[in-house]
Structures are given as C-alpha cells and as structure tokens.
Amino acid sequence: MTQFEKLDLLLREYGGTIQTFQVLNNGISKSVFYAYVKERGLEQAAHGVYVSPDTWTDTMYILHLRCNQAVFSHETALFFHDLTDREPLKYTITVRTGYNPSRLQEDGFQVYTIKKELHEVGTTTMQTSFGHAVPVYNMERTICDLLRSRKNIEMQVFQDALKQYAKCKDKNLRMLMKYAAMFHVENILRPYLEVLL
C-alpha cells in the first residue's frame, strides 16, 4: 500500500476531515502529506486541519478542532438544546481567561471568557448536524451564562429560553440553582423561576 493510499484510508476513517498530527501519528511525513493535500485538492479549513473537496464543511467541528478548549455556549447552546427557534447568526463559544480570542473574533465568532475553575462546569457533548461530537454547555449552565451576559443578550431570547426550559422533562432545578450560586446570578434568576414554576 502506498502512502497516498494509506492517506486515502485515513481521510475516509476521519470522515473527510484530517489533522496534521493524525497523519504524523500514522508514520507519514509532513512533506508526503502536503504533496497529498495538493494532489487530492484538500482545503485547509484551519491551521493543521484539512478537508476533502467532496466533504461538507462542518464549521462547528472545525472550530472545535481549531480551539479544543472552546465550549459552545449562550445562543449556540440554546439552539443545541432546542431552547430557541432562532438559529444563531454567529456561533458563540466560551474559552478560559488568558486565551487570546482575537483570531476567532476576526473570523466572526462571538467569544466569551471565564476563569479556569468555572470553564468545565456543565460541559457535555452533543452532535452537530453533520454528526460530529462537540463540547456544549448543558441547559442549566447556559441559562446562567445568559444571565451573566445579560447586557449582550436580548432579554426576549432569555425569557423564551427559560419558558422552554420550564417545559423540559429533563430539567434539573437543583443543578440550575447550584450553578446560579456559583456564577452569582441566583438573585436575578429566582424571580423568573417563581413566575414560571
């Protein structure tokens, strides 16, 4: 089997999206890989991320590969959890404080930062519409994030999301109040919940 044939198999195995480190881990040199990229017409979707020309580009998955600490949050997380019917105009992510988000912002992503010890709280994994697994904050964390960022969020979006959350069978009010205390939004959230529940 030639190295190009091996790369064809790898590309298929990874669903048409491949990263340079995956190629190197399979014993193929960068020079052979770059010749393959040119020969097969792969597109560079991000630094070290290449996509086959016959593969639909999954922007959310590419963003996750590009910045693996990014967690989909705010309006994007609402959309994942069916707590809104509005498809986000921009994808919203949260990264740890200290990460430089300027490149992501230049590329049209809305980026929030949070201290390291709160970054992983409420993280779950969900499937994009293309079937790729990406990190997303759970419903309870998302509600708290919306309240924390209420100056940047339309209040109607928050209220509609909270109404949808109240109807959910899998809501976890105990977790919601725990997160509200952690993120210092408990006093803001409580009156909304009293009206809805």
Regions found by a protein language model. Name each.
Residues 1-16:
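Short amphipathic alpha-helical interface segments
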Residues 11, 24-25:
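Residues that cap or flank secondary-structure elements
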Residues 6, 17-22, 49-197:
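Nucleic-acid-binding surface
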Residues 26-38:
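Short amphipathic alpha-helical interaction segments
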